[in-house]
Amino acid sequence: MQKRIVSSLYFQVLLAITLGVILGHIYPDLGADMKPLGDGFVKLIKMIIAPVIFCTVVTGIAGMESMKAVGKTGAIALLYFEVVSTIALIIGLCVVNLLQPGAGMNVDPATLDASAISAYAEQAKAQGIIPFLLDVIPGSVIGAFASGNILQVLLFAVLFGFSLHHIGEKGKVIFNVIDSFSQVIFGIINMIMRLAPVGAFGAMAFTIGKYGIGSLVQLGQLIACFYMTCLLFIFLVLGSIARANGFSILRFISYIREELLIVLGTSSSESVLPRMLVKMEALGCKKSVVGLVIPTGYSFNLDGTSIYLTMAAIFIAQATNTPLDLFQQITLLVVLLISSKGAAGVTGSGFIVLAATISAVGHLPLAGLALILGIDRFMSEARALTNLIGNGVATLVVARYCDQLNEQQMHEALSNPPQVVKLDQH
């Protein structure tokens, strides 16, 4: 029993995170030097994400009996994403107005060092609904895979899957080749995931070493407010959605606990995308639903990022004594409904979207971003964890409404203690 616990990924990642915090606190410089370990692990995962999505989506769509089912799945998923993301934005707005974590700081925007956020501001200029939609279409198929753009790969995979389904028996050989290739890819993921504790250790040691636990105290009210709101959203909103669809949010969280720990260590929900594809299938969701909902959710269903965006924007207004009336806050909400869809599940993307939103709204001082630049990294964990849980719940809900969920299999998987899920495609 003790040997099984020690050898489990859950225990190893938890131990690695703890050691990372200790090293970063006691030896800050050495902790900051551990950054390549975390970056290297995330890059290894990113290396494999594009082929994983392609194989999963193509085999899922091509293997379906009816193409109408794919259209229905996509429509229900997008509707769900929009409704739940809007709820997340509204909850963030309500809590930050109620608790007012930035009130009383009386910061003069003119005294803030805006040079630190210049790089983010430049990236933010490229944000917008038209550029975002055009960016979904790759300049070339090879370019989509080379850049690792999830939505571009997803678009090509959907079209490829439709075409493969359309040619019927003629495409059987190609289908089998892609299916076999996916087994090789998931074998590679098995090898990479053994390095998860190393990646989590490096990322956590860097975070504590560079920013220090002391930096949490200065703006701790905003961090505490944000974490509390994320917990409120997970257990109240997602918990209610889960209960309405026949499962417990607590049991689901327990089911994906290894993935949650990896995300906690790396601050990137993208780092467990391949594992989530397999785990959601093992939970009873059809491959076609999982292949569409999970990757799409990484751009369109970022609940944690939505909460962060509203809270951070209003916090800046409160801290700099910038008055925002109800109409201006509603305008901010509408802009965020669009801009939040451009945030990918990687560390730092939420901050870029925040910069884009503040630039677009015009009511808030862009220099105010410097206030939260130092603590943004500490809030990225809660963002990523909330995003991951939200996408998992979304997959189960969409699968259920599309009659693509084996509910008996789901209840059995959630009732039993989480087992090690082998990453293959059998």
UniProtKB/Swiss-Prot annotation:
Places the protein is found: Cell inner membrane
Example of a GO MF term: succinate transmembrane transporter activity
Transmembrane segments: 5-25, 44-64, 76-96, 142-162, 184-206, 222-242, 307-327, 330-350, 352-372
Pfam families given in the database record: SDF (PF00375)
Keyword presence, Transmembrane helix: yes
Keyword NAD: no
UniProtKB keywords: Cell inner membrane, Cell membrane, Membrane, Symport, Transmembrane, Transmembrane helix, Transport
Matching SUPFAM superfamilies: Proton glutamate symport protein
Organism superkingdom: Bacteria
Membrane topology: Multi-pass membrane protein
GO terms under cellular component: plasma membrane
PROSITE patterns per UniProt: NA_DICARBOXYL_SYMP_1 (PS00713), NA_DICARBOXYL_SYMP_2 (PS00714)
GO biological process: L-aspartate transmembrane transport
Alphabetized InterPro entries for the sequence: C4_dicarb_transport (IPR023954), Na-dicarboxylate_symporter (IPR001991), Na-dicarboxylate_symporter_CS (IPR018107), Na:dicarbo_symporter_sf (IPR036458)
The family this protein is said to belong to: Belongs to the dicarboxylate/amino acid:cation symporter (DAACS) (TC 2.A.23) family.
PANTHER family: AEROBIC C4-DICARBOXYLATE TRANSPORT PROTEIN, PROTON/GLUTAMATE-ASPARTATE SYMPORTER
Stated role: Responsible for the transport of dicarboxylates such as succinate, fumarate, and malate from the periplasm across the membrane.
Protein name as it appears in the record: C4-dicarboxylate transport protein
Gene: dctA
